[in-house]
Amino acid sequence: MNAIKFLTQNEAIVMDQLLMGKKYAFSTDSLMELAGLSCASVIQHVYPTISKKVLTICGPGNNGGDGLVASRHLVQFGYDVNIYYPKRTDKELYHNLVTQCKHEGIEFLESMPTNDQLNNDYGLVIDSIFGYSFKGDIRSPFDTIIKDSLNNIKTPIASIDMPSGWDVENGNIKNLFTPDLLISLAAPKLGSKSFKGKHYLGGRFLPKEFLKETNLTIPKFNGSNQFVDITNYQN
């Protein structure tokens, strides 16, 4: 496997800005669509048969948007998905994503399921609360969701880009939950080096010239795959 560069928080922010600048001309919605599709593809690969429902917990930013897109694609793949999206934004992009999900028949929950419900009624919980831009304290209602629910349930958890609440560069310094599956997007973040579960890289959208300009090294994607397994990668 080719070498992999783990990004600092600032590197991830700068690269995202470059990707969406005039030179490379990507838009937020196009990147979100590709990221969400890759997340759904990883989940279908790792959990091909889930007899129970899937719950996606969405945060207010782009990571939550990735979760909305992934949920829509999972329904297309045959999964039964619920979404809990407690803190929404007024931006049109997110309104559109919610509308698209509703037209797929996805139910948006009014309240967070209890831990018993999560353990008994759901076969997978998707954590799309916070991504690479997270820093500082975990605020309501996500502090309760993470500390009271995700920290204590037995249902498998799949985190998008970073496990929510982890320090992007230093990892799980707050002793929070560890997901069963982590789907890093574009390139893994420095804080995920300590992650010991199933680890996949998604977000297959970086142009060759972009990789050269940024000296970013990522593994090769095979064929038309939207992801690559980096679980056994050793630095």
UniProtKB/Swiss-Prot annotation:
Record: residues binding (6S)-NADPHX: 62-66, 131-137, 161
Note describing how the cofactor binds: Binds 1 potassium ion per subunit.
GO cellular component annotations of the record: mitochondrion
The YjeF N-terminal domain, residue ranges: 12-218
Cofactor names: K(+)
A Pfam family of this chain: YjeF_N
Keyword Isomerase part of the UniProt annotation: yes
Family annotation (Gene3D superfamilies): YjeF N-terminal domain (3.40.50.10260)
UniProt keyword terms in alphabetical order: Isomerase, Metal-binding, NAD, NADP, Nucleotide-binding, Potassium
Catalytic activity, EC: 5.1.99.6
Reaction catalysis annotation: (6R)-NADHX = (6S)-NADHX; (6R)-NADPHX = (6S)-NADPHX
Residues given in the record as K(+) binding sites: 63, 127, 164
InterPro entries in alphabetical order: YjeF_N_dom (IPR004443), YjeF_N_dom_sf (IPR036652), YJEFN_prot_NAXE-like (IPR032976)
Nucleotide-binding among keywords: yes
Record-level Gene Ontology MF annotations: metal ion binding; NAD(P)HX epimerase activity; nucleotide binding
The protein's enzyme class: isomerase
Function noted in UniProt: Catalyzes the epimerization of the S- and R-forms of NAD(P)HX, a damaged form of NAD(P)H that is a result of enzymatic or heat-dependent hydration. This is a prerequisite for the S-specific NAD(P)H-hydrate dehydratase to allow the repair of both epimers of NAD(P)HX.
Family as reported in the entry's similarity comment: Belongs to the NnrE/AIBP family.
Protein's UniProt name: NAD(P)H-hydrate epimerase
Organism (species): Dictyostelium discoideum (Social amoeba)
Organism lineage string: Eukaryota, Amoebozoa, Evosea, Eumycetozoa, Dictyostelia
